[in-house]
Amino acid sequence: MSSSSNPVSQFNNISLGGRISGTRGILKFTTNNITWKSENGKIETVSSSDIKRANWARVTPRIFQLILSIKGGATVKFDGFKEQDYEVVRKYLSDQYNVSPLEIIELSSKGCNWGEVKVNGPMIQFTTDHGKVGFEFPISEVSQSVIGANNKNELTLEFHHDKAMDDDDETMVEMRFFTPIRPSKEGEEGGKEKKVGEDGEEDEEDEEDAEKEEEISALEQFQQTIMNKSDMVSNVGKSLVVFSAIQFLTPRGRIDIEMYPTFLKLHGKTHDYKVPYESISRLFQFFRPDQKHIFFIISLDPPIRQGQTKYAHLVIQFQAEENIHLELNLTDELQQKFKDQLSPIMNGNANALICKILKALTGKKITIPGNFQSDSGANSIKCSLKANEGYLYPLERCFFFVHKPPTYIKFEDISNIEFARYGAPSVRGGSNRTFDLSINLKNSTSIQFVNIQREEYPSLFNFLKEKKLSILNPVTTGPAMIIDDDDSDDDDYEPSESGSESDEGSASDESEEESEEDKKAKKKQKK
């Protein structure tokens, strides 16, 4: 702790208490505010006039926590104080903010893993014996909640990932609560109470089933409270729009999408996910070769988790001709903010509408394929990744394979590319109907796409040469091997409510598009 004369006191190596991750920073007390600034520049400020009460608690043998109760029911905590800091903090709060006393509270330290869990304002609180708090954390930290498919008495909470954390930092990613079935009441003879049915049989099983249903219902209510409170803590109120029963390929299932001003919520049969818009890194839209379905892909950084499985890409499939009617809950402020992008009533193609809304809310451009065409005229090549058949889309600065697993490969990460099983058709017995494509990455891993139709080789070879990707074993014989040096770019998708591609924008400075410097270099080469 470093301290200067009042009215300023400063404490180093302080983290926001009660958070799942513990990014450190500097805490400064000034006349009007308490300000915390993290190592990466994030700032949290508490006005001195908003402080109602202050508590002091030991959280480890050597580390103490300052707990501030704020007007409106919120709680702000700061971890990292030393025992000798108590008197400095107490005196400052009393003299400068007229907040006293700095009450010392005792947390449960017995290590019990059983107790009562409840929602206390914006916090989830776990209490043990004699009502002592074992731990608590903000509901806003919860990214998703899951009731086990095979164990209906278990609720799993997963937490948001803090991008500011280093790779070697530790953070909690998951917590599970188990609700045991309450024992049946004992009868006068010390056994279970027994009910007798109309047929004279004892209905012990019915009683146990009723108790089990009661416990499961309580767990589901607790889960719903968490998700509802999660929205309330974010001060977002009612959702802007809901898309019901949308077909997801990854993760698989029919999922409802609820969109809010700062995040979207995915609600499935067994899982709920909360996805902040700031974690959406890219948006893609690809037509399937049959032109009857559209892939819409939401790339996430960090990915969401389902148990031990991470989903870095959400893959949605729409019918190309599906039209819907939407009514958006836009406040006057939101209407003013998105006046050129969103309107209270929207009609049109389902895919185009969700693209338009997400583009407005996230500020991300939607990348669609450029001018690459396969032998059949499609923007993709049919192939398999491991045992899963799908489509490989060559884009301006990356490859994207849809859909299982969805795989994103940036050109800058590629070391070289190798063709396999491509036999020259002029050699008897040397011709294969399919060939394989191995993409070797700079991190020494390799991704192999197999069972590509040999007719796709010329267009794929030309594309790789145009992008100046290193090919280890090029086959340049044959009449079709002519490099088509056009300045094709992936277009930015400007979704129209009709869903047609006639309103697509031209190339700009999006990361998936070709830079002006690259274009000038190509023109010089042509000259």
UniProtKB/Swiss-Prot annotation:
Gene3D superfamilies: 2.30.29.150, Pleckstrin-homology domain (PH domain)/Phosphotyrosine-binding domain (PTB), Structure-specific recognition protein (SSRP1)
Superkingdom field: Eukaryota
CDD domains: PH1_SSRP1-like, PH2_SSRP1-like
An annotated GO cellular component: FACT complex
Region: Disordered, residue numbers: 179-213, 479-527
Keyword tags: Chromosome, DNA damage, DNA repair, DNA replication, Nucleus, Transcription, Transcription regulation
One of the record's GO molecular function terms: histone binding
Keyword field contains Lipid biosynthesis: no
Function: Component of the FACT complex, a general chromatin factor that acts to reorganize nucleosomes. The FACT complex is involved in multiple processes that require DNA as a template such as mRNA elongation, DNA replication and DNA repair. During transcription elongation the FACT complex acts as a histone chaperone that both destabilizes and restores nucleosomal structure.
Protein name: FACT complex subunit SSRP1
